[in-house]
């Protein structure tokens, strides 16, 4: 028997459905990322750029805000200076030789005249004879003239028809405020010392005390 023919007619045995495995083949685009990867990469890059721009803008804003307070402080200081100047212009002061007390300026005369002349002298200074409003003011005035031997007219006069003491503004004397020593009679005016208030003739010569409202300077 010719064995060569036998071997030549022999076909290799294959199981049904079996296919010879072939070595994997790779296309040129096999290593490239899918299309959506490219889109994601581009979107990420754009997001990073926007984030970077936002950070730059934020840093500029922070620097501006940090530098702004000194400017505002200068503005506030300028405003305070203007307010201070305005406040100075609104300061209330008394004229020379006048004594401040609360909202009043008081003037103690250096000469003696009758009550009416003292009243007129006060009027020439845009003032009136003193109106004592309370006990505290009474003490202040008596301390002001303490050590002086003179007596001083004030804006208090006896009204014979009404049998009462009245201040020159028309108000009636409160007896709890002042106790007047002397007679209550016509043409009587009140004079004050550093200890008491007396009744004296309005025609007698005495010093006087004027008052006026504090003025703006």
Swiss-Prot record:
The chain crosses the membrane at residues 46-66. A motif (LCK-binding motif) lies at residues 31-34. Pfam families: Lectin_C. Residues 101-211 form the C-type lectin domain. Disulfide bonds join 122-210, 189-202. Keywords: Disulfide bond, Glycoprotein, Lectin, Membrane, Signal-anchor, Transmembrane, Transmembrane helix. It is a single-pass type II membrane protein. GO terms for molecular function: carbohydrate binding; signaling receptor activity. Residues 1-45 are cytoplasmic. SUPFAM superfamilies: C-type lectin-like. It is found in: Membrane. Binds CLEC2I/Clr-g leading to activation of natural killer cells or costimulation of IL-2 production and proliferation of T-cells in response to antigen stimulation. May contribute to the formation of the immunological synapse between T-cells and antigen-presenting dendritic cells. This is Killer cell lectin-like receptor subfamily B member 1F. It comes from Mus musculus (Mouse). The gene is Klrb1f.
